[in-house]
């Protein structure tokens, strides 16, 4: 039985994770898991893991690394007591030779003993603080996926990984822009402050109503488009690298961790028991 978005907005973390794990909820996670850090995923063979870690280190705005699994272990114990990467994301993209091969709600059959999981912080995390400040976010209010765009900003390459930065966009009233920028700056594990705001052409974006991922979001009177570095950036780099196998979250469909949204270090206390 499916579970609706509005119900999950007020559910506990345990209820939310159970709905995702069972397949009862397969949609976006914006506005869900209030108080907890959300994460983008990149899962790739160990042979490419060090180069990918270098890529994240060299590009911390779009790739804020919050967790790395042990090789072959799908249990991300540093991010949560019982997180199983194979089932605990609403939707996954499976790439083969750099091409999107399938979209799945469960990657148990795709799992291999040589895979390493990288978790990267997500801007959905700071959205709760923005909304608590009284700034409405159109995609959350309308049950849509935040719009994401390929920008003209080059990332720093590492090994086979390279490409343009992807950015997410939120429309904000002009008199609240500086405030929203400062709110998000307090969440460096979730991309931090915006990389740009104003005319989208400055990022090489021709039409904000034609996003590369997610849903188009209208720009209302007196609103300014604000752009944050986005964790879909690694997916662009992975496509360019043409790895034989790579699995990511479907854009907008995140892993919700047990880590507090304002944590300085993205490791839950229960991880100490696993040493």
Swiss-Prot record:
SUPFAM superfamilies: PSTPO5379-like (SSF160920)
Name assigned to this protein: Putative hydro-lyase SPO1111
Pfam families: D-Glu_cyclase
EC number: 4.2.1.-
Keyword Thylakoid listed: no
GO molecular function, one term: D-glutamate cyclase activity
One example of a Gene Ontology biological process annotation: glutamate metabolic process
InterPro entries, sorted: D-Glu_cyclase, Putative_hydro-lyase, UPF0317
Organism whose genome encodes this protein: Ruegeria pomeroyi (strain ATCC 700808 / DSM 15171 / DSS-3)
Family under the similarity heading: Belongs to the D-glutamate cyclase family.
Class of the enzyme per the UniProt entry, highest EC level: lyase
UniProt keyword list: Lyase
């Amino acid at each position: 039985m499916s579970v609706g978005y509005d119900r999950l907005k007020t559910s506990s973390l345990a209820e939310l994770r159970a709905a995702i794990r069972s397949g009862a909820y397969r949609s976006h996670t914006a506005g869900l898991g209030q108080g907890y850090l959300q994460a983008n995923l990149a899962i790739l063979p160990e042979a490419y893991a060090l180069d990918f870690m270098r890529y994240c280190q060299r590009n911390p705005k779009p790739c804020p690394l919050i967790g790395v699994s042990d090789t072959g272990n799908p249990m991300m114990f540093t991010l949560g007591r019982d997180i199983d990467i194979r089932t605990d994301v609403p939707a996954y993209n499976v790439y083969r030779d750099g091409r999107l091969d399938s979209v799945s709600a469960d990657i148990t059959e795709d799992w291999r003993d040589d895979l390493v999981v990288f978790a990267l912080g997500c801007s959905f995390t700071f959205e709760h603080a923005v909304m608590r400040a009284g700034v409405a976010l159109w995609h959350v209010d309308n049950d849509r996926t935040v719009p994401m765009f390929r920008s003209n900003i080059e990332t720093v390459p590492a090994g086979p990984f390279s490409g343009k930065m992807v950015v997410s966009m939120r429309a904000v009233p002009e008199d609240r822009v500086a405030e929203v920028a400062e709110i998000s700056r307090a969440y460096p594990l979730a991309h931090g402050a915006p990389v740009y705001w104003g005319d989208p052409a400055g990022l090489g974006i021709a039409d904000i109503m034609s996003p590369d991922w997610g849903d188009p979001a209208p720009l209302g009177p007196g609103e300014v488009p604000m752009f944050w570095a986005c964790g879909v950036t690694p997916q662009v780099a992975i496509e360019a690298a043409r790895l034989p196998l790579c699995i990511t979250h479907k854009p907008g469909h995140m892993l919700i961790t047990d880590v507090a949204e304002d944590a300085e270090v993205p490791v839950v206390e229960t991880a100490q028991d696993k040493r």
